[in-house]
Swiss-Prot record:
InterPro entries per the UniProt record, alphabetical: Ig-like_dom_sf, Ig-like_fold, Ig-like_Receptors_ImmuneReg, Ig_sub, Immunoglobulin_dom
Regions of this protein lying in the Cytoplasmic compartment: 274-325
Ig-like domain sequence ranges: 34-118, 129-211
Entries under SMART domains matching the protein: IG (SM00409)
Official protein name in the record: Natural cytotoxicity triggering receptor 1
Superkingdom, taxonomy of origin: Eukaryota
Membrane-spanning parts: 256-273
Organism: Mus musculus (Mouse)
Keyword Aminoacyl-tRNA synthetase annotated: no
Record Gene3D superfamilies: Immunoglobulins
Glycosylation, residue list: 139, 216, 238
Cell location: Cell membrane
Length: 325
């Protein structure tokens, strides 16, 4: 019993230490870019990193390597810092992450921030077939063409989704859509690029107009790649959309783990105590049974000896009486 309780206590201490160790990693910060993550070549951009109020240092990493360090200045917004990139080029376009330090602890990495530089190549041409104004349910195709051969084209809907559609191509790419709904209407631009983060100048805008009667909710795109939900490159830049309090979920998870661990240990202890009580009760009943048997055995032995003694006395009395025999 004692070794089992000792083992359970050690298990609880080890798991508690494991939870405390995991807790010693601070929640991940929030990262975003202003004015946008799409920056014209040569223009400046600000990268913001926001962590805990007690953060003393922030580090910015570019493509997995250390890039810059900033310390928060005494102000009302001590929980965030600004990293300034004076001139955006193809060498500064890519994936950024940030960390912060509070005391002796470091946070987890932020979500990746993808910075895109534009204006590096020729300006592509964009047009839509069969025409810019179509009726509900028609199929349309956007064509993006660049004089200089490239490897990938991107189609972006302005002030619409935070994602863009991409296609591989040499000097031209096609972006089929349809059957179109009112969600497809809007202004589009396209870009050419040699990688995901270095793009050409934007094309001239092309506005897609959707006309017709009441929209049929059963209309669905025939090409799986033409759906407005089909995107491969995330361009989320909204600061408020990135503000997610992961600390709440971290603490909730840790508390649930602790409660679960406590319940497991409590149930195990109750089971062990019940087993111990049943074992002792069984031993006690066995001892009582043996005691009763021993008492009966002794009583029979005593009765036997007393009977033998009476018989011996009777025989002696008979022998002592003259003429008894």
């Amino acid at each position: 019993m004692l070794p089992t309780l000792t083992a359970l206590l050690c298990l609880g201490l080890c798991l508690s230490q494991r939870i405390n160790t995991e807790k010693e990693t601070l929640p991940k910060p929030i990262i975003w870019a202003k004015p946008s993550i799409m920056v014209t070549n040569g223009n400046s951009v600000n990268i913001w990193c926001q962590g805990a109020q007690s953060a003393s240092e922030y580090q910015l990493y570019f493509e997995g390597s250390f890039f810059a360090l900033e310390r928060p200045k005494p102000s009302r917004s001590m929980n965030k810092v600004r990293f300034f990139i004076s001139q955006m080029t193809s060498h500064t376009a890519g994936i950024y992450t940030c960390f912060y330090q509070s005391g002796e602890l470091w946070s987890k990495s932020s979500n990746p921030l993808k910075l895109v530089v534009t204006g590096l190549y020729d300006t592509p041409n964009l047009w839509v077939y069969p025409r810019p104004e179509v009726t509900l349910g028609e199929n349309v195709t956007f064509f993006c063409q660049l004089k200089t051969a490239t490897s990938k084209f991107f189609l972006l809907k302005e002030r619409g989704s935070n994602h863009i559609q991409n296609k591989y191509g040499n000097i031209q790419a096609e972006f089929p859509m349809g059957p179109v709904t009112r969600a497809h209407r809007g202004t589009y631009r396209c870009f050419g690029s040699y990688n995901d983060y270095a793009w050409s100048f934007p094309s001239e805008p092309v506005t897609l107009l959707i006309t017709g009667g009441v929209e049929n909710s059963s209309l669905a795109p025939t090409d799986p790649t033409s759906s407005l939900d089909y995107w491969e490159f995330d361009l989320s830049t909204n600061e408020s959309g990135l503000q997610k309090d992961s600390a709440f979920w971290d603490h909730t998870t840790q508390n649930l783990i602790r409660i679960g661990l406590a319940c497991i240990i409590l149930i195990t202890l109750v089971w062990l105590l019940t087993e111990d009580w049943l074992s002792k009760r069984k031993d006690h009943e066995e001892a009582n049974r043996l005691t009763n048997w021993e008492c009966r055995r002794r009583w029979r032995m005593q009765h036997y000896f007393e009977e033998e003694q009476r018989n011996a006395i009777s025989m002696m009395e008979l022998k002592a009486t003259p003429g008894a025999l």
